[in-house]
Regions:
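Short helix-boundary/capping micro-motifs
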Residues: 11-27
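A short LG(V/I)-centered, amphipathic sequence patch enriched
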Residues: 41-59
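Alpha-helical linker/hinge and terminal dimerization helices associated
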Residues: 43-44, 64-88
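Central regulatory/effector-binding core of bacterial HTH transcription factors
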Residues: 90-148
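Short beta-strand->loop
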Residues: 152-162, 244-258, 265
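Secondary-structure junction motif
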Residues: 180-204
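Hydrophobic hinge/microswitch elements
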Residues: 205-250, 254-257
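A late-sequence structural motif
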Residues: 252-285
Length: 285
């Protein structure tokens, strides 16, 4: 059996990025944290932490951290099932998802499920698949169904995609010509503009104008409000700007544009994630 205090010290160092910050969280001295981590490394016979700023895990350390996260989640669920009083168990989990799924689905679901101590990793769907296969995240959202051993998959309600632009841009570009205007995206091959364009103009829609790359989907929305281009984004993200009039919907009343998403998580953690699965309205795929 591994020492719980040493495991807690090791995890705290990587969560906070330093031995000093870990000591403050744990309420012990920095020397005590260092000794516990060193003892754990000696017990296992390998280095777990790169002594950099911030501190980073070695390959073995990354695997150990995943083990700690999984074990903590299952321990918390066991104590809940047994109806016992938990001694302040703090389960930490990682979820990977594309930016549109984070903004359009995940954040609200996390709030409804009252999940705590989570980390969201923003990646495209293909990268989410890789992270799931390597076990570097506990769960993930992709835009296509997957079949991975040991991973449970669920289909999510389709997400409505809406296109908007500033009032000035809408005046300058008739609806039929909007595709020629600059579009704001997080990556050159972002699928959201194409999904929206196909729903509104058909599969053989005109070629897009220039793409302006932004750091996040939220920045795309802000950029659209500033007149930098038009944006296709989850409907929920655009409700506020549409209500204030800083953005105008393009092609309202036409066919609904939707994007499908799928929720995947490690099967052994399904019970621990039940509140989030419910909040996402997920159905077994």
């Amino acid at each position: 059996m591994l020492d719980y205090a040493a495991l807690a010290a090791f995890a705290a160092v990587l969560r906070t990025g330093s031995f000093d910050a870990a000591a403050q969280i744990l309420g012990v001295t920095q020397s005590a944290v260092s000794q516990r981590v060193k003892a754990l490394e000696e017990r296992l016979g390998c280095n777990l932490v790169q002594r950099t700023r911030p501190a980073r895990p070695t390959e073995a350390g990354q695997r150990m951290l995943r083990h700690i996260d999984d074990a903590t989640l299952m321990e918390a669920q066991l104590i809940k099932d047994l109806g016992l009083l938990a001694p302040n168990i703090s389960a930490h989990f990682r979820i990977a998802a594309p930016s549109e799924a984070i903004n359009g689905l995940l954040l609200k679901a996390l709030g409804r499920a009252q999940m705590q101590n989570f980390e969201i990793v923003q990646r495209n769907s293909d990268d989410v698949l890789d992270l799931l296969q390597r076990g570097e995240v506990n769960a993930g959202i992709t835009s296509r169904p997957l079949s991975i051993s040991g991973v449970a998959s669920y289909s999510l309600p389709p997400m409505e995609i809406v296109a908007c632009a500033s009032p000035a841009m809408v005046r300058n570009y008739p609806e039929a010509a909007i595709l020629k205007a600059p579009r704001l995206v997080t990556a050159p091959k972002s699928s959201l503009p194409d999904i929206w364009a196909k729903a509104h103009f058909g599969n053989k829609h005109d070629a897009f104008g220039p793409a302006r790359i932004m750091p996040s989907l939220g920045d795309c929305v802000i950029g659209a409000q500033s007149g930098l281009g038009w944006v296709a984004a989850p409907n929920d993200m655009l409700k506020g700007p549409l209500e204030t009039g800083s953005l105008v919907q393009i092609g309202s009343g036409r066919a609904r544009a939707e994007k499908a998403f799928y929720w995947h998580l490690q099967q052994r953690l399904e019970e621990a994630f039940t509140p989030l699965i419910t909040a996402l309205n997920a159905e077994p795929a």
